[in-house]
Amino acid sequence: MSFWHNTKSIVFIATVLLISLLSPASILGASAKNPSEGNKLKESKIQSYVSDMQPGWNLGNTFDAMGEDETSWGNPRVTKELIQQISKQGYKSIRIPITWDHRMGDGPDYKIDPAFMDRVEEVVNWSLDAGLYVMINLHHDSWIWVHQMGENRDEVLPRYQAAWTQIAHTFKDHSHKLMFESINEPRFNSGWGSEDQTHYVHLDELNTSFHKIVRESGGKNTDRPLVLPTLETNAAQERLDELYQTIVKLDDPNLIATIHYYGFWPFSVNIAGFTTFEEQTKKDITDTFDRAYDTLVSKGIPVILGEYGLLGFDKNTGTIEQGEKLKFFEFLTHYVQEKNITHMLWDNGQHFNRTNLKWNDQDFYELMRASWKTRSATAESDLIFIKKGEKVQDTSINLELNGNKLTGIFVNRNKGDKLHKGKDYTLSGNTLTLKASTLEKLTASGQYGDNAELTASFNKGADWTFDVILHDTPKLESAAGSADSFAIPAAFNGDRLATMEAVYSDGTNAGPQNWTSYKEFGYAFTPSYQSNEIKLLENFFNEANDGIVNLKFHFWSGEVLNYQITKNGNEVTGKVTSN
């Protein structure tokens, strides 16, 4: 995973459901427990190993970077202090993605740069010293050169084997808490989502070759845990079935399966109107991990979710609205753990700041940390909008308590002023009602935007924060510019943009991804609250026809504004139209 990961969109938009043709079999001892079914079966040793890795973290965009060194993709040089802090944050395992391509010499030896190997070993040792389980792999090599296996097998396979021969030799005496992953997100063409049966043959050959090389390299590699991916690390049924067959064939009690998950694609990138964590997004989670459990875990093959996150994060972590993002991670973490699958957060530097060693979004971390042990309560929204000039009304919000009890509501995050139940708010079942008098006091400043934060605390799990926002209808203005730098002046008046629709005069969808009128946030358009404008990005105009395009901007308050642009080559003009 890295900044180009959104090229996989077609994979996530249509998950294939097939009926497994495999008969139940256990190759690694007793089946692992499934907490959701109340099973209390004894775990195999390798399942216990994987369970002890929970939770995990990825050192992304560092050794997998394809520049001159580990800093070439913008992250600082890895320090021992960083690794120690990851352990202190509660993580039990670390995945260190590594791209070897430009660190290897020519054939037939394909010698790896000794200085680079030494540096990788140094960070691996720091991680082991910090008490972490460690996973290393071949990372972007998968799409740089390994994907050519079909047409260039005689070069790809020896190079792959040479890489693992050298890696296995270097680490053969390291602790068993170090594991090897054969290849990251393997694919065998230039795109994603291929179902060509020959690709399964190629992956089976790579995994089998990897297994043989490591096992024959001696030392602790004779029984070191090895991690094998599905095709593209995707959890479609056929891909799980194919990996199952490979693992059965290898007949080795120290094998682990791995998949990746970045959510239901429309929600993950904020497209097609999927702005909230709704039932279809939730069902994608349950379907995915039910398949992984039924096909692998229930048959004694442990599974590591080697990467997870949201694809919109590649643009910025605000692509998905904060509360909706938190609900996604709360439920995902809960469900993956319920299926006895270990999860490893993908972090390319956008989550844990590697310079100041602090979380960029503390709420995100606090919710994840709480979810490692229990469920957290959430709400239907974290946004409470009060429209300026209108009479303030009582506001009701449905809570998703997840078995918890509300213990108090406080003004701001320091929990200084506590609201009084009955006077300031009421709770009836799962419905929280904030009194009009309370909201009126909180927005008395008359200033647009965030006026207060209300922190709801519960007997267990993380807090839930509501933003109390004073707003008015946003105002847009006429604009003129070019397709590579067009922006609409906008007075947001405290409101926040949720999504944008685009259609031609005949009603057909305009711009990229024209199967939907709702465009992708951060790809086709983006708001700038600092410069007070909505930018229509070059990606949008690259796939928009000349002529009139009618836009509709949807805001989180419920406000909807119409706007019309006219494109003539590279020239673009825009004007407000009536709602």
Protein language model features and the residues they cover:
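Sec-dependent signal peptide cleavage junction
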Residues: 22-36
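Active-site mouth of glycoside hydrolases
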Residues: 37-225, 230-240
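Aromatic-rich peripheral "rim/lid" segments of glycoside hydrolase catalytic domains that contact
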Residues: 315-417, 449, 459, 473-477, ...
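Short, aromatic- and glycine-rich surface loops/edge beta-strands on solvent-exposed regions
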Residues: 445-460, 544-565
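Edge beta-strands of extracellular beta-sandwich domains
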Residues: 461-472, 559-578
